[in-house]
Amino acid sequence: MVSVVGEMFCNPYTTELVVRRRRESLKRERYDVFDLSNNLIFTVDGGIWNIRRKRVLRDAAGIPLLSMRTKGLVPMRYNWEVYKGDSTESDNLLFSAREPNLLSFKTSLDVTLPPDQSSTDISSVEPDFQTFGRYIGSSFKLFEPIHNTLLAEVVHDFTWGGLIKGSYSFKVRVNPYVDFAFVVALLVITDDTSNLR
């Protein structure tokens, strides 16, 4: 079982989701996450132009499940930290994600769970998970690198009209016993990183 946010987000069957992104204003964007029956599962909101690009993933009732933000004010590469709830305390760190290569045109991330020791420097730690993206859009596959196990796949439904309007969607397929809240958080981070290229 791959449980990062919580076991309640690990289904014993393949989970398929639809994620719709829309720009609410020049400063804010929102992601709505639905199951295939069109039931709202999560929302993600946050500012595009705030200093740390903070995003909050909430359940359908509006309760914060996790918060995402960039590490540092002007990063050379995009480093993200993800915390439980609306916290930014180091003891609530769920995982960190960073681009493995600054000069790559593909959107890929190395994802690291917090180390057992008190140090939060993940620069020399091997990633626990990796995403591999495409050259265009925010599609990616999530792998567990030691056994090269595919955990999830995200497909960006790219259209030029959606790009101009600032709204588009994703299809998400998460394998059994894999935390789908974790995958949605990686989708938001990947999309944000891809949009800044």
From Swiss-Prot:
The lineage of its organism: Eukaryota, Viridiplantae, Streptophyta, Embryophyta, Tracheophyta. This is Protein LURP-one-related 9. SUPFAM superfamilies: Tubby C-terminal domain-like (SSF54518). Signal peptide: none annotated. It holds the Pfam family LOR. InterPro entries: LOR, LOR_sf, Tubby-like_C. It comes from Arabidopsis thaliana. Might be related to the phospholipid scramblase and tubby-like superfamily of membrane tethered transcription factors. Transmembrane segments: none annotated. Belongs to the LOR family.
